[in-house]
């Protein structure tokens, strides 16, 4: 490939769909045969039917009420309007709308960046809400919420409802485990990697004052974007690329050093894939790279509603540049319905790692994040979500946008089919041996 600035390109949002689509198109045109998976699009009808039944159950035909995919819904899990209660509390205290938007961004950034897969056994119990227990993404969301409202993330003694970089850099393992209720009896996947990510987030916030202000707050992103916006009849208009670039530039340093890099600069959630090289017809390093930027995309999706509805109330252009999220619920949906099947060699390799990690009874394959099986799975997941959207819209006779499809359908359907097929764990059909910074 020939691009003027490879680092800039691979960190861009446009690179995600472009690089992964090459893999999807190659597998589709190769009779569904990838290096690690077999893809059978003929089985997509079953996915569509299952997904549409969930939408009908949860929303009836009121499709316009489906919110875009975002962290807001996780923070409100258990039918508790935690976010709205905070907003009401702040408004009642006379806090202006722009500062409310900063506080929401503070909370959402922290909450999203701790949202890598929690594993099958960890739970968070809310003593403040009658000892309700939440697991997985919702548990991590509620844990992050209580750390925020208790002031554990703020260095401002006069305002506990903030996230400050300096405070995050000082977070200890004991404080992390206490905040997330981690113990030998309640283990959380990737604890050390997750804490390091938080500490690195603190460094990023503290060393990027142009974006995060003198306080090193995620919420100062609001003011940075306002400085970049154009005005249209009094409305602040910003392009998704500006939001994206601020997140990528601001948070590049949080990623582990071992990730794919060019000239020593890490690219974030980007990986080398043999299938991509084959699809490109080239063995060159740049032609083998695919990008996902899943946590940044999840963050971007989650920030759009606060940015649009509070404070400066931005109008955000080109939101459709984002892709579906390449994580285990969306990907698991296609695997559990047989649209994707691991090749024999990949399955045996994954099962060997499962057994090496001490589980000799499980038939669930396990892979590390850089394994070609995981990387190809994620590429195909993005392509399949794009393929799925028009099929669902045709059946519903309504034009959902991709973030609505993920929120009401694919992510939820992936979780529900997992619970049906694996009721003991409700876990995904493929396990990731994770450091707490992927998925």
UniProtKB/Swiss-Prot annotation:
PANTHER family xref list: PROTEIN URG3 (PTHR31687:SF3), PTHR31687
Function of the molecule: Involved in uracil catabolism.
Name of the protein described by the UniProt record: Uracil catabolism protein 4
Organism: Lachancea kluyveri (Yeast)
Annotated InterPro entries: DUF1688
Family membership noted in the UniProt record: Belongs to the URC4/urg3 family.
């Amino acid at each position: 490939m020939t691009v003027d600035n490879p680092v800039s390109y691979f960190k861009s949002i446009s690179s995600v769909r472009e690089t992964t689509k090459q893999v999807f198109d190659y597998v589709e045109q190769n009779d569904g045969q990838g290096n690690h998976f077999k893809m059978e699009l003929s089985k997509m009808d079953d996915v569509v039917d299952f997904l549409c039944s969930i939408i009908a159950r949860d929303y009836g035909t009121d499709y316009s009420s489906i919110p875009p995919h975002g962290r807001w819904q996780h923070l409100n899990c258990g039918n508790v309007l935690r976010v709205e209660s905070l907003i009401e509390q702040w408004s009642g205290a006379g806090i202006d709308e722009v500062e409310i938007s900063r506080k929401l961004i503070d909370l959402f950034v922290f909450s999203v960046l701790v949202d890598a897969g929690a594993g099958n056994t960890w739970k968070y119990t809310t003593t403040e809400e009658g000892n309700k227990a939440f697991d997985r993404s919702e548990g991590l969301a509620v844990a992050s919420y209580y750390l925020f409202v208790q002031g554990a993330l703020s260095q401002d003694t006069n305002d506990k409802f903030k996230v400050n970089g300096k405070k995050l850099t000082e977070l200890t393992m004991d404080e992390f485990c206490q905040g997330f209720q981690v113990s030998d009896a309640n283990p959380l996947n990737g604890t050390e990697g997750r804490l390091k990510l938080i500490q690195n987030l603190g460094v990023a916030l503290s060393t990027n004052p142009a974006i995060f202000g003198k306080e090193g707050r995620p919420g100062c992103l609001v003011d940075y974007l306002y400085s970049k916006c154009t005005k249209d009849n009094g409305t602040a208009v910003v392009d998704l690329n500006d939001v994206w670039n601020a997140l990528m530039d601001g948070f590049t340093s949080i990623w582990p050093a071992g990730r794919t890099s060019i000239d020593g600069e890490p690219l974030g959630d980007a990986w080398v894939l043999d299938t991509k090289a084959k699809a490109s017809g080239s063995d060159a390093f740049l032609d083998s790279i695919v990008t996902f930027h899943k946590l940044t995309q999840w963050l971007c999706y989650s920030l759009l509603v606060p940015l649009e509805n509070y404070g400066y109330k931005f109008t955000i252009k080109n939101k459709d540049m984002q892709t579906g999220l390449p994580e285990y619920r969306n990907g698991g949906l296609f695997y559990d319905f047989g649209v994707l099947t691991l090749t024999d060699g990949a399955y045996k390799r994954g099962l060997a790692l499962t057994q090496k990690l001490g589980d000799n009874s499980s038939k669930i394959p396990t892979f590390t994040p850089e394994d070609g099986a995981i990387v190809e799975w994620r590429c195909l997941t993005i392509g399949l979500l794009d393929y799925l959207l028009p099929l669902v819209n045709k059946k519903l006779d309504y034009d959902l946008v991709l973030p609505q499809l993920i929120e009401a359908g694919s992510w939820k359907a992936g979780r529900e089919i997992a619970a049906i097929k694996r009721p003991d764990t409700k876990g995904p059909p493929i396990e990731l041996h994770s450091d707490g910074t992927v998925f």
